[in-house]
Design a protein with these regions (language model features):
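Conserved AdoMet/S-adenosylmethionine-binding subsite of the radical SAM
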Residues: 1-100
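Auxiliary Fe-S-binding modules of radical SAM enzymes
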Residues: 67-149
Length: 149
């Protein structure tokens, strides 16, 4: 299906993931009719067809920023020369998520989300990294601007 869409002119692909590690990805998404290998194959196909590839990275501090998870993400980004990573907060009950992911994914100490982003920038200087969430200063500026209208 993706191949046909790319042949018809699709020029951008966005993939959401919580991890670049198969067991952690699959325990969260619980895919039916596809698996992590299909995600990887789709990324490879999109790259061969020169589509713009963006990842929605669902971030859960303490899991997403584990050293092994960071390195797996870096390898995925480099392997498929991902163009953009858009970070998103994983909005889920933290206790539920920690129970589901226990013992899954790549191990290692938490590095912090700031270090995760720094590592991505270092390993893939071409990568665009963004987040739609606005920082406190930007939110305050927007609020002040609308109050004076």
């Amino acid at each position: 299906m993706l191949d046909a869409l790319l042949q018809e002119g699709l020029d951008a692909v966005r993939v959401s993931l919580n991890s670049a590690v198969k067991d952690l990805y699959e325990c969260y998404y619980q895919p039916i009719g596809y698996g992590w290998e299909d995600v990887e194959a789709s990324l490879a196909l999109a790259r061969r067809r020169r589509a713009y590839i963006a990842l929605n990275l669902l971030v859960f501090p303490g899991v997403t920023d584990r050293l092994g998870e960071v390195e797996a993400l870096v390898e995925l980004v480099r392997r498929h020369r991902i163009d953009q990573v858009q970070t998103r907060s994983l909005a889920i009950d933290p206790m539920q998520y920690l129970e589901v992911v226990r013992g899954r994914g790549a191990p290692g100490p938490g590095t912090g989300v700031e270090q995760l982003i720094r590592r991505l920038k270092q390993a893939a200087p071409w990568l665009v990294i963004g987040n739609f969430a606005r920082g406190l200063n930007e939110r305050l500026q927007c609020r002040m601007a609308t109050e004076h209208v």
